[in-house]
């Protein structure tokens, strides 16, 4: 009996067709003109409380924007897409999202997100993150997509659960952040779980 082969992923390099459009949002490459909007939340301590960086001063934020602007194409494992999230009707940049190509061999990806708190409660982070899952599972045909977060970041955990991701791991005191030990929590979704969720959404329409 032959062993079934894993579905092929798209050949690298891979560049999405920009903008990635959702019901209300455009996910597009970051540009230098986005500095003011991105720095407006990167400098805020409450935004960076559970992240691996920040708050950022203007120089650090300009460097961050420049790095994000260069991350528009996936070429090899470890590469990132870092995209501005813009409300289509108003043109307002409300945050940015990250898609990580973790492993070609194992068809693994990852997602991340940072949003301005002034725009919280409107579902933008959930909508943009779901677009990244769709990119990973539908376009790139990945098998598994995960997200890691500080164990104290309950708002982020709720977002991932709304997406249908499962809590897979809790690493105790795994990171030393801002002068204290912090737990790390891992959420993930498999391709078959995404397909089941997609079919359920279709039935509810």
What kind of region is each of these model predictions?
Residues 113-115, 121-138, 154-162:
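Conserved acetyl-CoA-binding loop-helix of GNAT-fold acetyltransferases
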Residues 146-148, 166-184:
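Conserved catalytic-core motifs of GNAT/GCN5-like acyltransferases
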Residues 91, 123, 153, 179:
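Conserved G/P- and acidic residue-centered "switch" motifs that form tight phosphate/ATP-binding loops
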Residues 93, 97, 149-159:
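Membrane-interacting alpha-helical segments
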Residues 138, 144-147:
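Short, basic (Lys/Arg/His-rich) helix/loop patches that form interaction surfaces
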Residues 1-118, 135, 139, 180-205:
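GNAT-family acyltransferases
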